Structures are given as C-alpha cells and as structure tokens.
Amino acid sequence: MGKIRQGFIKRVARELFNKYPNEFTRDFEHNKKKVQELTNVTSKKIRNRIAGYITKLVRMKEEGKIL
C-alpha cells in the first residue's frame, strides 16, 4: 500500500492547479520547475510531492475524473 499524501501538499497543489490551470502538464519534470517558480517551497522533497500530485490532477482531469 502507498503512503497517503499530507493535507497541506494536496491543498497547495489544488490551489496552484486551480489558479494556473494552463501552466501544468502530464510531465512531472515540467511541473516540478513550475512549482519552483510559482511557490517559495525550499524543500526538494515537498516540491516534488506537490509536483507529483499536480501531475496526478492533470491526468485525472484529462481522463474526465474531475472537473
């Protein structure tokens, strides 16, 4: 079983995804750079987790699972 993401990671990711919907793609590396530009997160681990969740949100939106 996988780990559950912490609430603040989901909250920040959703806020970024809703505020800048056209900035993110299915590419994790691209999203990682965008998270670095758009936030003041200094931790590499937290940045990567936020970017990973945003990548998941983009994929879910494209598949029609979220609006």
Swiss-Prot record:
The cellular component terms of Gene Ontology attached to this UniProt record, alphabetical and capped at eight, are: cytosol; ribonucleoprotein complex; ribosome
Q: Which domain of life is it from?
A: Archaea
Alphabetically list the UniProt keywords. Answer: Ribonucleoprotein, Ribosomal protein
Matching InterPro entries:
Ribosomal_eS17, Ribosomal_eS17_CS, Ribosomal_eS17_sf
Please verify whether the record's keywords include tRNA processing. no
Pfam short name (any one): Ribosomal_S17e
One BP term from GO = translation
GO-annotated molecular function: structural constituent of ribosome
In terms of Gene3D superfamilies, this protein maps to: Ribosomal protein S17e-like
Checking SUPFAM superfamilies in the record gives: Rps17e-like
* Family designation: Belongs to the eukaryotic ribosomal protein eS17 family.
Name of the protein described by the UniProt record: Small ribosomal subunit protein eS17
Q: Could you read off the lineage of the organism from its UniProt record?
A: Archaea, Methanobacteriati, Methanobacteriota, Thermococci, Thermococcales
